[in-house]
Amino acid sequence: DKSKVELSWEATPDHSESTSNATSFNVYMATGTSGFDNGTNIKSNHHIMELEPNVQYNFYITACNNGGESFPTEVLSAYYQPQATETILVVNGFNRLSGPAVINNEDEQGFDLREDIGVSYGKTLGWNGYQQVFSKYNAGTEGPDGLGFSDESLAGKVIMGNTFNYTVEHTEAIATAYKYNIVSSSSEAAFARKLNLDKYKCIDLILGLEKSTTNSLKYYKTFTPDMQRILQQYTQQGGSLIVSGAYVASDMKSFTDKQFLENVLKINYSPTDSCTNNSSITGLGLNLNLYNYYNDTHYAAPKTDIIHPTSSAICAMQYADQTSSAVAYKGSDYSCFTMGFPFECIINKEARNKLMRGILNYLLTPKQ
């Protein structure tokens, strides 16, 4: 029954404390533009429910036991379109939480917030300003010449980080096409063979600010080797791909990484191709503005990737300096559309929705 959706999840075991295991789960739900309800407590790790047509449903889950309630999962979304013959899978691959870029070499030491301010869990007030002095030779010096001295440009400034709810914006945008059923998944579930990807006409992969850094506590690679292999197999079966993120190409450094970019996403990338003049983007008949500045409502992408098409693909969008911000490929085998910026960082909702409709039309309309 296409009007029913099944939520399923796995508890995270704490091997250091046996009494911390979950005994039940709270399922929180929001419909349309309303807020989340107070949750429904269930004992199992799956939940089936009926969807009203043309209404977006958003969900998150917490684990419960006698000690209380866990942090929430990411938000996942679903949408039932009665006339739809195809289903689109939205995959959240933006899981990164990280401190800022670290400099630590023979001569310099510190946190380089201009290079990368990091990603907080939700909002943070954690920064006073940008470090000005990095030289280790200034260690022990007091005042503006001392190692670690910073300005006060970020004092009192609230900066939004990762809110783990970007499937909501992507599902909203896809739903405005009124053509597709929409389901969603975490990247861990999608690429651990927890679901059959070949069932889906198109995968929309959210990568946000995902990237691997030496100072992260976890591995946040944009495309892990498993993901690369599975997405290659998916496209070989004729599946369409939408990918967006600030580091979709720059996080791909090895030879096999670059082969994946060229062979699957049809992207050529040079390590120097990072764009900071990225506040405005044009393409598909649209002028778009990005959150490329720190603010308290949405995470920012101050640096994004310049991605060039291979000979079989096209440049579909451009930054203000005429460099390529998106690459599109429409072959007889499969189609894909890759943005070197996070789709959800487009400020205007109507522009976001129009862009998504244009991308879907390009990818899923049969080639003449």
Task: Give residue ranges: language-model regions.
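Beta-strand-rich modules
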Residues: 48-69
